[in-house]
Curated annotation (Swiss-Prot):
The protein's name: Cytochrome P450 52E2
Subcellular location(s) per record: Membrane
Keyword Metal-binding annotated: yes
Domain of life from the UniProt record: Eukaryota
Gene from which this protein is expressed: CYP52E2
Alphabetically ordered keywords of this record: Heme, Iron, Membrane, Metal-binding, Monooxygenase, Oxidoreductase, Transmembrane, Transmembrane helix
Coiled coil spans: none
Cofactors required: heme
Family indicated by similarity: Belongs to the cytochrome P450 family.
Residues that coordinate or bind heme: C461
Entry GO MF terms: heme binding; iron ion binding; oxidoreductase activity, acting on paired donors, with incorporation or reduction of molecular oxygen, reduced flavin or flavoprotein as one donor, and incorporation of one atom of oxygen
Entry EC no(s): 1.14.14.-
Length: 519
């Protein structure tokens, strides 16, 4: 059958009209009556004709130009409300930066939501782990992993000290220009692999990084593993952003990278299963994967959970350190205050390492970290899907004070990045880097669900204390060694305190953190 251009155009017009009519029929004749019965009212609806396709194009363009978080910021400014319907590619999403609605989704009505498409999008690399599973699978994962993140396990600083000192001595002390962001990723994968496997990738030491581990297809070096993990996460981020179309995003390189990661970790898994720890052996040295073999002998379960924890243990801490280093270089008066507090509390470079408790008690240090996490939360944008009919407590109706009906199957996104910079919550200087805001009375600040840099509710990050401990101790060592941090591209911060950021897993500075550490 031959179809000419005019016929194709007519068919396209009919299809478009059908989709537009379907969306209108659903909203006005199905959604709205059901919402009214429950005493709910819809939030504002924002369409970009036709079918939200123009907004989809703008969103994709912003993502590729490392401007996605600012695109969402401007979008909520256009909404004029903290919760709204947004039409994207024919689908109605609910978007929210309202703390009470986020609290409801993540805590109060936690059982009414799942991760939706995220499981399938991330399965290729991460498998059945705590960050991909929902429901009973997630509960089992959390029960398995929670004991591994007790204070005793995350507060040992000696192994961190070795890698931090290697980074400082080999890469920072010469006064050369470095990309601190790259080195922080090396640092955190070295410390995370030592915590997880008992052996480090040693990417900060080129000689050790080239030592290979035997695998089914030959040697895999720590350096190769780190590169493969980074490469796999790049495409994983694209798959997550593609939403329901995740299956269209794949490349042979992605699957090769996943295979390298799996082979590398399988070496440690089978080694731990084959050589169970005898009583008293290395009793003072905690190794995550070895402890996990006491709970399960399934190698796939151990590998998947280890990969999930590695994702959190490497990238979130590296992002926190990268953004913090940038701000300390761009705001020398803040660095001077921090350095003075560190020397007063912990002494100079040759002093004994601080304890976990001492790090938490250094108020200036913790204020700096809190402020960076406010401006750059670890997961700035997140998604959920309703698995039962449920409601949000506020945001509906003409005044935004009525409940909102959230039907089963409804997709929701919440923008932590936008919420934690919102002037209505944090005041007129909400986009400014001002660590001393945390000295103000708590009631004068946002409280509770206004600030969730590690997410919240039952799915709050298990490795939160590990990340904060490593970041805190790294900053202490930098302050002990260097009088000044010189950032070589301070102009990337605009009047809105916006840095070009790559929205990946997690977000990072798109231009790196080009830095010189001055002794």
């Amino acid at each position: 059958m031959n179809i000419n251009f005019s016929d194709a155009l007519m068919l396209g017009g009919i299809s478009l009209s059908f989709l537009l009519a379907s969306q209108a029929i659903y909203f006005y004749f199905i959604y709205s009556p059901r919402a009214k019965k429950l005493g709910c009212a819809p939030p504002p609806i924002f369409f970009s004709f036709p079918l939200g396709i123009p907004d989809l194009i703008r969103l994709v363009n912003a993502w590729f130009h490392d401007d996605l978080l600012e695109w969402f910021t401007h979008r909520f400014e256009e909404f004029g409300r903290r919760t709204a319907f947004q039409s994207v590619a024919g689908q109605l999403w609910i978007g929210t930066i309202e703390p009470e609605n986020i609290k409801t989704m993540l805590a109060t009505s936690f059982k009414d939501y799942s991760l939706g498409f995220r499981y399938n999008a991330m399965y290729g690399l991460l498998g059945n782990g705590i960050f991909t599973l929902s429901g009973d699978g997630w509960k089992n994962s959390r029960a398995l992993l929670r004991p591994q993140f007790s204070r005793e396990q995350v507060s040992h600083l000696e192994s961190m000290r070795t890698h931090i000192n290697m980074m400082i001595n080999n890469h920072f002390k010469g006064g050369q220009v470095v990309d601190a962001q790259v080195l922080y990723h090396n640092l955190t994968i070295d410390t995370a692999t030592e915590f997880l496997f008992g052996e480090s990738t040693n990417t900060l030491d080129p000689a050790l990084a080239q030592q290979g581990l035997p695998g089914p297809k030959g040697l895999v070096t720590g350096e190769q593993f780190a590169e493969a993990f980074t490469s796999a996460l790049e495409l994983l981020s694209v798959r997550v952003m593609a939403g329901a179309a995740w299956f269209l995003v794949w490349t042979p390189k992605f699957w090769r990278s996943c295979k390298v990661c799996h082979n590398f970790i399988d070496y440690f898994v089978y080694k731990a299963l084959a050589t169970p720890m005898e009583k008293g052996q290395d009793a003072d040295r905690y190794v995550f994967i070895r402890e996990l073999t006491k709970e399960t002998s399934d190698p796939r379960v151990i590998r998947d959970q280890a990969l999930n924890i590695l994702l959190a243990g490497r990238d979130t801490t590296a992002a926190l350190l990268s953004f913090t280093t940038y701000y300390l270089g761009a705001y020398p008066e803040v660095y001077d205050e921090l350095r003075e507090a560190v020397i007063a509390d912990f002494g100079s470079a040759d002093a004994e390492p601080p304890t976990f408790e001492q790090l938490k008690q250094c108020k200036v240090l913790q204020n700096v970290i809190r402020e960076v996490l406010r401006l750059h939360p670890n997961v700035p944008l997140n998604f959920r899907e309703a698995i039962a009919d449920t409601t949000f407590p506020t945001g509906g109706g003409p005044n935004g004070d009525q409940p909102i009906f959230v039907p089963k199957g409804q997709k929701v996104f919440y923008a932590t990045y936008v919420m934690q910079r919102n002037a209505g919550i944090w005041g007129p200087d909400s986009t400014s880097f001002r660590p001393d805001r945390w000295n103000e009375p708590r009631e004068a600040l946002a409280s509770g669900w206004d600030y969730i840099p590690f997410n919240g509710g039952p799915r709050i990050c298990l490795g939160q204390q590990f990340a904060l401990t490593e970041a805190s101790y790294t900053l202490v060592r930098i302050c002990q060694e260097f009088s000044r941090i010189e950032v070589l591209h301070p102009d990337v911060i605009t009047a809105r305190n916006v840095m070009k950021q790559r929205m990946r897993l997690p977000n990072s500075s798109s231009g790196g953190v080009i830095t010189r550490f001055i002794r």
